[in-house]
Amino acid sequence: MTTSFHDLLQRRAAEDGGKKAFAFVDRDERERSLTFAALYAQARQVAALLRRASAPGERVLLMFPPGLDFVPAFYGSMLAGTASVAAYPPDPRLGQAAYAGLLAIAADAGVSLILAPR
């Protein structure tokens, strides 16, 4: 029997919804966590957005700083069937070079869409 990634994530959300799926500790040593239910719900929202804005197999640049926000974006990309290309947001203190580096990554990867936190 073949089980898809979506099936596995859905099952964990149903069976272990309240359990911690991921945790992130910031530099101030504060922990933020994401349950399986929250991860699945957020990943489905991201997947729905990506399905409207791109096609399966297309490359999507996930431009997120370190933290939990990246996780549902990455899982949502997998649910949507897109290929994730992860990159840190450019540091404005570095000037144009930071943006040039990000543009080079996007061009080299052939991304069709950039997804970033609000």
Q: What are these language model-derived features?
A:
Residues 76-77, 105:
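Hydrophobic/aromatic ligand-binding patch that stacks against planar heteroaromatic rings
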Residues 81:
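Structured binding elements
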